[in-house]
């Protein structure tokens, strides 16, 4: 990060892991870079991930996830963080298919989301990036899904750098 540096206009670099799921590719962020995030940081990371998703000719349909659904926990720290980040993304990109804050199962289940939260901007779309409130939650999620569920995992893919970078994790196989 210090040698290559962020590309012009990027305030905070980030990373994503891509998992092959039964719904198609699922991008998780920020899985390896940023420890302490503000709502603006999360909005910036959301933009970087959306840009990466588009490089695969996929329209980003983004869920900002935490332990709360659309204000069900009004005073929780990470719920407030994700709610504020969602508002920033909505303001910057009113035409994007993005919503939050919501629990992961709500983000991944369009029927359930439509039933309980029909106002969601995600509508009946299948979410493809999930944006987490912290490095620890994103890192735990990708490791859990990759290890316990046996999903193929690509990454971390670094986002927002001047040049392409790929980092190998300890114990990476040749396939990874």
Regions found by a protein language model. Name each.
Residues 1-80, 84-124, 128-176:
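Anion-binding alpha/beta catalytic cores of soluble intermediary-metabolism enzymes, centered on
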């Amino acid at each position: 990060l210090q040698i290559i540096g962020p590309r012009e206009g990027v305030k905070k670099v980030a990373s994503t892991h891509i998992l092959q799921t039964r719904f198609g590719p699922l991008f998780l962020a920020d899985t390896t870079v940023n420890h302490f995030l503000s709502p603006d940081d999360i909005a910036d990371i959301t933009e970087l991930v959306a840009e990466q998703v588009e490089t695969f000719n996929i329209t980003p349909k983004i869920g900002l996830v935490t332990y709360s659904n659309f204000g069900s926990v009004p005073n929780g720290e990470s719920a407030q963080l994700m709610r504020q980040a969602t508002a920033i993304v909505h303001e910057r990109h009113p035409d994007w298919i993005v919503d939050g804050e919501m629990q992961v199962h709500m983000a991944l289940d369009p029927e359930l989301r439509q039933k309980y939260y029909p106002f969601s901007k995600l509508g009946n779309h299948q979410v493809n990036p999930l944006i987490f409130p912290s490095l620890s939650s994103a890192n735990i999620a990708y490791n859990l899904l990759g290890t316990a569920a046996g999903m193929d995992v690509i990454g971390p893919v670094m986002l927002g750098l001047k040049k392409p970078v790929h980092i190998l994790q300890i114990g990476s196989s040749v396939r990874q």
